Amino acid sequence: MDRGTVGSAQSGRLLVEVRQEGTSAVVTPAGELDHHTADLLREPLEDCLEKGFSRLVVDCSRLEFCDSTGLNVLLSARLKAESAGGGVHLVGMQPVVARVFEITGADAVFTVHDTLDAALAE
């Protein structure tokens, strides 16, 4: 029985919104990013890159959890965006998500902003 525990397969655990802000694509994942839901973020990120957006702003303010699979999705998008002359900017990480980036050292390879306005102004 699925009790909605971390790591369990449950539809609707991650919702992703995408919108354009100037020359940036703003991608907002809401919920849990893990091995069950990673493709729900990977596909919109790749779609943005295919549409010519090399500057991706990922608004993490509604992201409740991120495991190593989710981190790899973001790292892959970063490499693709940088090879196209852009990058991936992370915004508003919750402490539990920021800790994953801190522990793995991934916070050193992403540009991290406190607010969406700050990310879009850069």
Please tell me what each predicted stretch does.
Residues G7, V27-T28, E50, F101:
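N-terminal non-cleavable signal-anchor helices
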Residues H113-T115:
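Short acidic low-complexity segments
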